[in-house]
Amino acid sequence: LIEKIIGFNAHAVVKTYDQAISKKRIKSKELNDLSNKLLFSNSGEGVLINKGYTKGLLLRGYSRNKFEKLDIVKNQNFHGNRKLNSKFISIGKELSFNFDIKIGDKVLIMSPSGIQTIIGNLPKQETYIVDSIFDSGLSDFDQNIAFINIKDLENLFDLDKSKRFLEIYLKDPKKIDFAKKKLKEIFNQEYIYTWSDLNKSLFSALKVERNVMFIILTLIIIVAAFNIISGLTILVKNKTREIA
């Protein structure tokens, strides 16, 4: 499970508060020592409309050529174009199955960002052609996340280019606490969160589950051992009587 989560999301994300992330920091030796891949991205929440059905989605945007650097795109279960062209969209396997959407189909994406008209504020709508289908191995990701070109996303959601996130893919994603400490030293004015922060409740639940299972197994072993010892004790007593 952890491997799938790490494989789908960036290991750490740097968000800027008020201005673009400094290029000097991005090119720093300290960051290059930690990471093996850096990508700029942006995201927004919208609604997919297809064949009379609607579905809320988290849309993530990448540049045309950077999209193919994601692990899910390199995955052998990925089908379609590995470039993220303008006016095209990449959706998950679960979403494709549930809505009967195939590569080449058109879908409508609605944004909460409005267009001012004489009758009031209307939400933006754009039509995209499904260009690829990914399979992360986690149904929650596959049915709730989609990818579009980052420029299309920023136009659709009225997002500022300077507020793009920096996604950091670490050389050793399991040493996340050490990496976060180092990243805070590099990006001291920005907000940093990691894959561990995003999934804290899930990992806490898994830890509790492991502890409970350990206790249950320990009790089963103790009861089984007690039964074996009791059985042997009774057998020895019976044999002792027979010998006597």
Feature locations, PLM:
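Hydrophobic secondary-structure segments that place a key small or acidic residue at a functional site
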Residues: N42, H79-I150
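Solvent-exposed, non-transmembrane alpha-helical starts
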Residues: A20-I26, I49-K51, G56, F67-I72, ...
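Short aromatic/hydrophobic contact patches that present stacked aromatics
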Residues: V13, F88, F165-E167
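Flexible glycine-/small-residue-rich
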Residues: T16, L59-S63, S111, S132, ...
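Hydrophobic, regular-secondary-structure patches
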Residues: L1-L58, N65-E68, H79-N85, K184-E185, ...
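Hydrophobic alpha-helical transmembrane segments of multi-pass inner-membrane transport and secretion
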Residues: L1, K207-A244
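Mechanotransmission and gating elements of multispan inner-membrane complexes involved in transport
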Residues: N121-M213
